Regions:
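Glycine-rich flexible loops
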Residues: 1-427, 439
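Short, small/polar-rich loop/turn modules that mediate ligand/substrate recognition or access, typified
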Residues: 508, 595, 600, 669-671
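Substrate-binding pocket helix/loop in short-chain dehydrogenase/reductase
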Residues: 518-519, 526-528, 621, 639
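Active-site loop immediately N-terminal to the catalytic Tyr-X3-Lys motif
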Residues: 520, 568-574, 596, 646, ...
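Active-site helix of classical SDR
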Residues: 542, 579-582, 587
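Alpha-helical segment proximal to the catalytic Tyr-Lys
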Residues: 547, 592-593, 667
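Short C-terminal tail/terminal secondary-structure segment
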Residues: 658, 670-686
Length: 686
C-alpha cells in the first residue's frame, strides 16, 4: 500500500488538523475503512473552561466518516476520566456511554466513538484503528495464528474476537502492556490498531502493516484458482441485462412488503465470478468480513441456486423460493439469539446473489444500496484472500447478532436525516426538461423521491437531473432522452429506471405539445402530431408503467397532467383539446383497471402555465392571441383575469397538485380530476 503522506502539506498543519489530515488519507483508502468504519485519535493538552491545562483525547465521533471528517467531528474527552476506568473490571454499554457524555470537554459535543476507551487506554499519543481488508483476510481463516506468525513474527500481537466496548478496551491495554516490544495489535475478525508518538508515526505504522499483509496475500494467491473455479457459466452481458430487468421489479416488490427499498444490480466481473463459483454456495453463508458490516448487509446474503435454470420465469421462481427460505432462517436466527429489548428488523436480505447473472443489493435509498454493494465487494475480496491461506471463517452467529442488534452500533443509523414523504419511492416524469415537468421532478425529489427525468430534449432532462442531485444528493435523479411517441424509446426509459433503482412507484405523464388552428385549415400532420404526443405518448408511457407496477405487486400512482381544455375546449384548439380528452379518458380507464392491483390513476387539469414552458412557444402564443382577438403582449394577463381568483398559475402550483396525487395523502383517491386553473367555471369537473 502506497503512503499518501505529504510533508509539504502536513508541515503547515497544527496537531488536530494533522489528525484530520491523516484520517482523511486513511478514509480515502477503501481497503482500510468503508462507510463510517474505523477511527483515529490524538492525546493533547488543552485549556479547559477555567484556563487549566487538561489532558484531552480527541477521538473520531460516532457515525462520522474518515474520508470526509472535519475538526468538529473529533469530540474531546478528558483523559483523567478515561484513565480512572482502568481500575474497573466491568462496565455496561449504556453506563459507558453516559460516563463518556459527562467526560466531554465540549458540552453538547458529538458522541465519541464506541471505541473511545480503547484509544484512551493505549498509552501512545496517536492511535489508528482500521478494518483493513488485507488484515481481516489474514485473520478470517482457520490457520490465522500460523499465518500471522509467518507474516509478522513478534512485531505484531493478535487478540481473539471480542465485541467493541469496555471489555475489549481493557484487554487491548493489558495485552499491549504485556508486549511492550509490539508495533501493532490485530483484532481477529475485526481489524488493526497501530500507534505512535505522532500522527505521522501511527499512519506510517498502519501503511507498513497493511503492505506486509498485501505482499503475503499476493504471494499466496499466485497461481491458485480462486473460489474453486466456476460452478455456473456466467451469461453474456445482454442476457444478464435482460434477466436483471425481469428479476429486479419482482425482487423489489418482494423486499418492499414492509417498507419500500431501492434495488441496484451489479454484474461486474468480481461479482459474477464469485456468485457463479463452486465455493459460493458455502463460503457466502459463513458470515461477514467484519462485524460492523452487518448493520448494512446483515450477517449473510441470500444465495439463489440457479445452476439448472435457463429462463426468466424459472429464475424468478427460484429467487422467490430463496427469499422465503432466507426469511424463515433469518427469523429463526433472531429468535435463537435475541436479547431483551431487541426488535426484529426486516427479515429479508440486503444482498441477493444470482449465479451466472450477478448481485442485487437493497437499501433505503440509492446511496445506501450502493454502500451495501460496496461492502459486499470488500467481503468478496476478503473471502478470496482468506481462502488462499485456509478455510474462510467469520464470527459465530451469536457474535454477529450481538453487533447487528447492538444499540451502540445502531445509533449510527439514527444520525441520518428523518425520511421525507416520498422516501424510498421511484418516480418517472416525462417532459421534465422544462416547465411543469421540471417543477414536478424537483418537487418530488425534494420530498425524498428518486426521480427519472425523461424528455425529448435529453440535454435538458440531464440538466434537471443535475439540479436535483445538486440539491438533494448524488444518485437521486437520472436524466435521459425520451421520445414518448416511440415505443422503443419509452421502453428504454423504463428499463433505465429499473436498472438504476429497481422499479417504479410513481408515473407523472406530463409530456405534451400544442398547435393552434381552426379545424378547417388544420393540416393532417399537425392533428396527428398532437395525437402522437398528447394521446399515444400517454398510452405508451402508462402501459409500460402499469406492466412494471403490476410485476412489483406493491401498488403505485399514475398522475396525468392534462389541461383545462378537457372540460372546456378552446376555439382554434381542436387538435390539442381532443388529444388531451383522449388522455383523460385513458386515465379514467386505468383507474378502473389498476384498482385491483393497488394502482391509482388521477388527473391534474392546469391552465395557462407560461413560466419556463416550451409548450407556449412564440407560434402558439401568437395563434392563441389571435384566437382571443388580443395582442400577444396581453395574453398572459388575459388568462389570469379570466379565472375566478384572478391569479397567475405557475409550474410550482401544478407540482403541488402532482405531489398530492403521487403521495399517500391521496391513498384513497383514484379516477379524480384536480383543477389548478384559478377557477375556470366552464372547466369545473362537476
Amino acid at each position: 500500500m502506497r503512503s499518501r503522506w505529504s510533508d509539504l502539506e502536513a508541515d503547515k498543519l497544527s496537531e488536530l488538523d494533522l489528525l484530520v489530515h491523516a484520517s482523511r488519507l486513511i478514509g480515502a483508502e477503501t481497503s482500510l475503512v468503508v462507510w463510517g468504519g474505523g477511527n483515529t485519535s490524538l492525546k493533547t493538552v488543552e485549556r479547559d473552561h477555567r484556563g487549566r491545562e487538561t489532558a484531552v483525547l480527541r477521538v473520531k465521533g460516532s457515525g462520522s466518516d474518515l474520508k470526509s471528517v472535519q475538526r468538529k467531528d473529533f469530540p474531546g474527552v478528558r483523559m483523567d476520566d478515561i484513565l480512572a476506568l482502568l481500575d474497573r473490571h466491568e462496565m455496561g454499554d449504556q453506563e459507558m456511554v453516559d460516563y463518556l457524555a459527562h467526560a466531554l470537554v465540549d458540552v453538547g459535543g458529538a458522541r465519541p466513538s464506541i471505541e473511545t476507551l480503547l484509544h484512551g487506554f493505549v498509552a501512545a499519543p496517536a492511535v489508528v484503528h482500521t478494518h483493513a481488508d488485507a488484515i481481516v483476510s489474514l485473520t478470517n481463516n482457520d490457520r490465522a495464528r500460523d499465518v500471522l506468525d509467518a507474516v509478522y513474527g513478534k512485531d505484531v500481537i493478535a487478540l481473539g474476537y471480542r465485541r467493541p466496548g469496555f471489555r475489549i478496551s481493557k484487554d487491548v491495554a493489558d495485552t499491549i502492556a504485556e508486549h511492550p516490544e509490539a508495533r501493532a495489535l490485530l483484532l481477529e475478525r475485526h481489524g488493526t490498531i497501530t500507534w505512535g508518538a505522532t500522527v505521522r508515526e501511527a499512519y506510517d505504522a498502519t501503511i507498513e502493516l497493511i503492505s506486509r499483509a498485501e505482499d503475503a496475500i499476493a504471494e499466496r494467491k499466485r497461481g491458485r484458482r480462486i473460489f474453486g473455479g466456476p460452478r455456473v457459466a456466467v451469461r453474456e452481458p445482454a442476457e444478464r441485462r435482460a434477466l436483471a430487468l425481469a428479476l429486479a421489479p419482482r425482487l423489489r416488490g418482494r423486499l418492499s412488503r414492509a417498507r419500500r427499498v431501492i434495488v441496484t444490480f451489479d454484474d461486474s466481473a468480481p461479482v459474477t465470478e464469485f456468485a457463479s463459483s463452486i465455493d459460493a454456495p458455502t463460503v457466502s453463508q459463513v458470515g461477514p468480513a467484519t462485524p460492523d458490516h452487518t448493520i448494512y448487509t446483515k450477517r449473510l446474503p441470500c444465495y439463489v441456486d440457479a445452476r439448472e435454470l435457463a429462463d426468466a420465469s424459472a429464475l424468478t421462481a427460484a429467487v422467490e423460493e430463496a427469499l422465503r427460505a432466507f426469511e424463515r432462517e433469518y427469523t429463526a436466527y433472531f429468535e435463537a439469539h435475541r436479547f431483551p429489548d431487541a426488535q426484529l428488523s426486516d427479515p429479508l436480505p440486503r444482498v441477493v446473489l444470482v449465479p451466472g447473472v450477478g448481485m442485487f443489493t437493497a437499501g433505503r435509498d440509492r446511496r445506501t444500496a450502493g454502500i451495501v454493494d460496496d461492502i459486499y465487494h470488500h467481503t468478496i475480496d476478503v473471502i478470496g484472500n482468506a481462502s488462499a491461506f485456509g478455510r474462510y471463517v467469520s464470527l459465530i452467529a451469536k457474535d454477529a447478532f450481538d453487533v447487528e442488534y447492538w444499540p451502540l452500533e445502531l445509533y449510527k443509523l439514527t444520525l441520518a436525516p428523518p425520511e421525507k414523504e416520498l422516501a424510498r419511492r421511484i418516480a418517472l416524469v416525462t417532459g421534465g426538461a422544462s416547465g411543469i415537468g421540471r417543477a414536478i421532478a424537483r418537487r418530488l425529489a425534494a420530498e425524498g423521491a428518486h426521480v427519472v427525468v425523461g424528455d425529448v430534449d435529453g440535454a435538458g432532462a440531464t440538466r434537471t437531473a443535475e439540479e436535483i442531485t445538486g440539491a438533494v444528493g448524488a444518485g437521486r435523479a437520472l436524466g435521459l432522452a425520451m421520445d414518448v411517441t416511440s415505443e422503443a424509446s419509452v421502453r428504454e426509459a423504463f428499463e433505465a429506471a429499473v436498472l438504476a433503482y429497481g422499479g417504479l412507484d410513481i408515473l407523472v405523464s406530463n409530456a405534451g405539445t400544442a398547435h393552434s388552428a381552426p379545424v378547417a385549415s388544420m393540416a393532417l400532420e399537425d392533428w396527428e402530431r398532437s395525437f402522437a404526443v398528447n394521446a399515444r405518448g400517454h398510452f405508451l408511457v402508462a402501459r409500460e408503467a402499469v406492466r412494471l407496477l403490476t410485476a412489483q405487486g406493491i401498488g403505485g400512482a399514475l398522475v396525468f397532467i392534462a389541461t383545462k381544455n378537457v372540460m372546456a375546449p378552446g376555439k382554434d384548439f381542436a387538435a390539442y383539446s381532443a388529444a388531451k380528452a383522449a388522455q383523460a379518458q385513458l386515465a379514467k380507464v386505468l383507474a378502473l383497471e389498476g384498482a385491483p392491483h393497488g394502482i391509482r390513476a388521477n388527473i391534474v387539469n392546469p391552465d395557462a402555465v407560461f413560466q419556463d414552458s416550451k409548450l407556449w412557444s412564440e407560434d402558439v402564443r401568437r395563434q392563441r392571441a389571435a384566437a382571443q382577438g388580443i395582442a400577444v403582449a396581453e395574453l398572459e394577463d388575459f388568462y389570469r383575469k379570466r379565472n375566478l381568483l384572478a391569479v397567475r398559475i405557475l409550474p410550482e402550483d401544478v407540482a403541488e397538485a402532482a405531489l398530492f396525487l403521487a403521495s399517500d395523502r391521496s391513498a384513497k383517491t383514484t379516477g379524480c380530476t384536480l383543477t389548478v386553473d384559478g377557477g375556470v367555471r366552464e372547466a369545473f369537473p362537476r
